[in-house]
Design a protein with these regions (language model features):
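N-terminal secretory signal peptides
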Residues: 1-12, 21-27
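C-terminal segment of N-terminal export signals and the immediately downstream linker at the start
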Residues: 6, 29-53, 57
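Extracytoplasmic "Venus flytrap"
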Residues: 45-66, 89-96, 117-120, 189-198, ...
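Beta-alpha junction/loop-to-helix N-cap segments that form part of ligand/metal-binding clefts
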Residues: 56-61, 78-148, 157, 220-227, ...
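Signal peptide-proximal N-terminal region
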Residues: 63-86, 177-181
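Extracytoplasmic ligand/sensor domains, especially the bilobed periplasmic-binding protein
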Residues: 110-217, 266-290
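Extracellular/periplasmic periplasmic-binding protein-like sensory domains
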Residues: 258-329, 396-408
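Segments of small-molecule ligand-sensing domains
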Residues: 315-324, 333-392
């Protein structure tokens, strides 16, 4: 049997994983029975906060990464290099926990690290990895400082909150204009770490220019166990729109508390809402989730490949959250770079990532193009919870529903 038939190559992998049309048709992911690729294997650091306040998101991120690793290995691994050997790390929901894992992964000889999830973790872990010229692919972390420090080892697959906030506000203005401008006042509720505080600063700078008056900006720590006082403030000020920016647990609690206290603004419009674009939230608390809009990471709903993976994830009894398909796509990106580099050498892999044009992901991005570590094609979409489902409402090219605004009474 020839080497070509024995091992993973780029085209074959994309044709035989969840990225295959046949998988989309059946809802399963078919992997051919082929021999292991030649080589001793490639170690990949898979780093997420799987315990602590961010554990749900971290576990979802690990799930997505490992599904991609398992599929690549079932297809034979990386041609000429062997199978991917995942080195799992738990950031424990803290930057310090993350950097400790980077040290362990470097000692273990990983070729690359994927993950991090939270902005403050990613800032610390990418810096730690840079000391060893260890390539690092950020899955989600949105703080733009992650990619503005000149770190040659750092690559962010998704958009940062500069792009996200600009898109979110342009879309909010468009939705409001289309409805006859019923909304004029806003309150912002955000978590107080790097992610939420940075986003709140951008919103405060940009919302007034779009004709919105900001009544109040309310920070809160992560974790927060009680939002009664926050919701009482919202109820007293009665804003037209509430903009939450927080992680999953706090988002759910805020939305449920608003529902319980019968606070009904014209719209709940999230920017990177931790639960707003989550099937878990919609299933477990459908009444609290109704009509919530979000600007966030999301898969391309027209992409049959993405729908195939969704079926497989749900078949495992899990929810298809953005952490899953972002990490899945990131591992495919790394596999493609390893294939092109034909080496697990860190410098060669860094160069291969920097020159990537990978398009076999699940996102509405187009081909990957890194400029100073940022994927220039990455962009968020707007979603809304409609009929106990999550629909894309903007941009029109990816939409499968139209926005409902103001929220029905």
């Amino acid at each position: 049997m020839s080497d070509k038939k024995q091992s993973f190559d780029r085209r074959r992998f994309l044709a035989t994983t969840a990225l295959g049309a046949a998988a989309a048709a059946t809802g399963t992911i078919a992997i051919p029975s082929i021999l292991r690729a030649q080589g001793s294997g490639v170690k990949l650091g898979v780093l997420h906060p799987v315990t602590g306040a961010l554990s749900y998101s971290g576990q979802q991120g690990r799930l997505g990464a490992m599904m991609a690793v398992d599929e690549i290995n079932a297809a034979g691994g990386i041609k000429g290099l062997g199978k991917i050997d995942p080195v799992l790390g738990d950031a424990q929901s803290t930057p310090e926990g993350g950097t400790a894992e980077v040290e362990k992964m470097n000692s273990a000889g990983v070729a690359c690290i994927v993950g991090g999830y939270a902005s403050n973790i990613c800032l610390a872990t990418t810096q730690a990895a840079a000391r060893y010229e260890l390539p690092y692919v950020v899955d989600v972390g949105v703080a733009d400082g992650i990619v503005t420090r000149g770190l040659k080892n750092t690559f962010r697959f998704g958009p940062g909150f500069g792009v996200i906030s600009k898109t979110a506000l342009a879309n909010l203005a468009a939705i409001n204009d289309q409805a006859g401008k019923p909304a004029k006042t806003v309150m912002i509720v955000h978590e107080d770490s790097l992610f939420g505080s940075g986003l709140a600063k951008l919103l405060n700078a940009q919302l007034p220019a779009l004709g919105f008056q900001i009544l109040e900006t309310i920070p809160h720590p992560t974790p927060t166990r009680d939002f009664n006082n926050v919701v009482l403030k919202i109820k007293a000020q009665n804003p037209d729109i509430v903009i939450p920016a927080n992680y999953y647990n706090e988002y759910v609690l805020l939305a449920r508390t608003m529902q319980q206290q019968q606070v009904k603004p014209k719209g709940i419009y999230s920017v990177l809402g931790g639960a707003a674009s989550s099937y878990k939230f919609v299933k477990e608390f459908p009444d609290a989730a109704k009509f919530i809009m979000d600007c966030n990471h999301w898969f391309d709903p027209r992409n049959a490949k993405a729908q195939a993976l969704k079926k497989q994830v749900e078949g495992k009894g899990q929810f298809y959250t953005y952490e899953v398909y972002m990490n899945y796509s990131c591992v495919l990106l790394i596999a493609d770079a390893l294939q092109r580099a034909a080496s697990a050498d860190r410098a060669k892999l860094t160069d291969a990532l920097a020159s990537s044009t990978f398009a076999g992901h699940l996102m509405p991005y187009g081909p990957t193009k890194f400029v100073n570590g940022q994927n220039e094609g990455a962009a968020p979409v707007n979603t809304q919870v409609l009929d106990n489902d999550i629909k894309v409402i903007l941009p029109a090219a990816f939409a499968n529903a139209k926005p409902v605004f103001p929220m029905p009474a």
